[in-house]
């Protein structure tokens, strides 16, 4: 079995006020909570989509995170996205192998070889940022209604000119972040930042006839 244990938090420097928001995931073995800190009528939100799945001897933990900043009119002023895929494998003797690289797609940069395969010759972060820029100025409702095709890719020609990756889950994470957003102190001119950190949280990864193994990864997600 594969489990994802989430610790989601956020803060903004220079402000002693604080607020909190929480979310849960229906996928077995995954849950989340989040908190942010801000000021004033602008709002900051953190949205997390996490699923854990296993098939045969391979398990996958997939997390998409979105941080948003809503202006005084309730429109998206800034968006930042990131994505993490963790794959766990097991052999026929019950020994589970955890990954050694827990970097997100944004953190991997050129080590995530999307640019070479992309018709746009653009990496993941560049395309994700183009998608984020496209959403800027929209209301949360408009962003949540972004149309995609059967493969989850955008259908709008302007968006496709800068972003050809699947965006339906990014759209949904942004919508969740908007729902979670709280007016805790952001102001005009602020930008939102997103940090994701993952680490192996499995204590015993060898299965026996009498004992199954839970491969667990701790995730910390921070919106600033």
Per-range role (PLM):
Residues 38-224:
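Active-site- and interface-proximal helix/loop "cap" or "latch" segments in soluble metabolic
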Residues 1-3:
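Sec-dependent N-terminal signal peptides
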Residues 11-33:
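Bacterial lipoprotein signal-peptidase II cleavage site
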